[in-house]
Regions:
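Conserved alpha/beta-hydrolase "acid-adjacent" motif
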Residues: 173, 177-183
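Active-site nucleophile loop of the alpha/beta-hydrolase fold
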Residues: 79-80, 141-149, 194
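Gly/Ala-rich beta-loop-alpha elbow adjacent to hydrolase catalytic centers
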Residues: 119-127
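Short beta-strand/loop motif that positions the catalytic acidic residue
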Residues: 163-165, 170-172
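Serine-hydrolase catalytic machinery in alpha/beta-hydrolase-like enzymes
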Residues: 13-114, 126, 157, 191
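Hydrolases whose catalytic domains are alpha/beta-hydrolase-1, hotdog thioesterase
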Residues: 126-130, 150
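Catalytic histidine-centered segment of alpha/beta-hydrolase-like enzymes
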Residues: 194-208
Length: 223
């Protein structure tokens, strides 16, 4: 799984209207799953991209491949600014509004079953801030940007993590300049080789996620 740099082909791509403009949801399904209509699965992940990157980030690709291999669905969601071709997104509140709208529409028209929300970096922050609004069963944070590097004057983002009332998995690079948040009774933190990009050992990223997912979602072989 090393060196993965592009997202696998989606079984279905859905454009979703949000108050911030159209977003795009790329639906990835376990083998043999009919992509038409509403998809019933034991559980699904809805993951967002980082501030300056897209859904082809190596960690997102690795998690998508691993989770669908377990029997879960994965949606890689593009924020409206990315769909519009912009490289820089709006501030957090606008991201949160769009993200919440995406998850609501996925629940209403695409996916049946419990959802884990999450993403990498800025996408992880968005998922944390909206965990209650989206009804997430759990939150997956890849490379959570705890403290801006070299900016001790800037407030820590740790309160966003602490406010999440459901189980959280944080997968963090050992040399991430944004630091590593502490664990807690409801927050598991797994440190893997690499920096903020989490591309040095994507197999370790995938392994951390596949170990955790069955603890927060029904197993695919459950009756």
């Amino acid at each position: 799984m090393r060196g993965v740099t592009s997202a696998p082909a989606a079984a279905r791509v859905v454009e979703i209207d949000t108050p911030q403009g159209p977003a795009r949801a790329h639906l990835h399904l376990p083998a043999g799953t009919d992509p038409g209509g509403r998809v019933t699965v034991p559980g699904a992940l809805v993951l967002g991209h980082g501030a300056g990157g897209g859904i082809g980030a190596p960690d997102l690709v690795a998690v998508t491949t691993a989770a669908t291999g377990l029997g879960y669905a994965v949606v890689l969601a593009e924020q409206p600014y990315r769909v519009a071709g912009k490289k820089v997104g709006p501030r957090g509140p606008a991201l949160d509004v769009a993200w919440t709208a995406v998850v609501e529409q996925l629940r209403a028209h695409v996916l049946v079953g419990p959802l884990v929300t999450g993403g990498r970096s800025a996408g992880a922050r968005t998922a944390c801030r909206t965990a209650v609004a989206t009804g997430a069963a759990a939150v997956l944070c890849l490379a959570f940007p705890t403290q801006p590097p070299g900016r001790p004057d800037r407030p820590s983002r740790l309160p966003e993590l602490d406010a999440v009332p459901v189980p959280v998995l944080v997968v963090q690079g050992a040399t991430d300049p944004y630091g590593t948040p502490p664990g807690s009774p409801t927050r598991r933190v797994v440190v893997v080789p690499g920096d903020h990009a989490l591309k040095k050992d994507v197999a370790a990223v995938a392994a951390a996620v596949t170990t955790w997912l069955p603890t927060v979602l029904p197993t695919p072989d459950a009756p």
